[in-house]
Amino acid sequence: LFDDEYEWCKESVFEVNYTEIGNSNDWAGKANQGNSDIIMLGARGLKDPNNVYVEGWGFAPVTKALNDAFLPDDPRKWTTIIDHEEFRAEGGTISSDVNQYTGYSVRKYHPRAGYSSTVGTEALNYKNNYRVIRFSDILLMASEALLRSGGSVGEAQDYYARVVKRAMGDD
């Protein structure tokens, strides 16, 4: 869902568009049209033998509590989190000598090979769009609205169940 081939797919309701061709070298703001948040979320010292991911700066590490909140067979875990031990077991390297190291990084907005600019400052010009509202968010908001307004608990549960069913690939 977070690769560029899925930008503005049926799951996406609202996205902030970014481009890798902004040719910007200006750290003063987002006027460059590139997504500079991506480089910040990537793991430091990352070397990917499959050349999918590239090194980032290691900001905003994922907590162990978030990692552990996922069931082992939940596909959303793999989409959301890079487990550093699993990554190393597959032949990759990631530095653990960083501030606030947890052993986990954000996968969905991790820098990917080929997603940054060849002009301007690379770190400022990633093309990854930011998914602001997804269809699953709408379903969860509908569920919450029903519960908070005294609506049908059963209908609220149905909306929630649709989210889980879709995430598991059954919808």
Kindly give the residue locations of the regions a language model identified.
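C-terminal substrate/ligand-recognition segments
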Residues: 75-166
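An aromatic- and glycine-enriched ligand-binding surface/loop that stacks and positions planar moieties
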Residues: 1-97
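Structured, solvent-exposed acidic/aromatic patches
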Residues: 1-33, 118-135, 148-159, 169-170
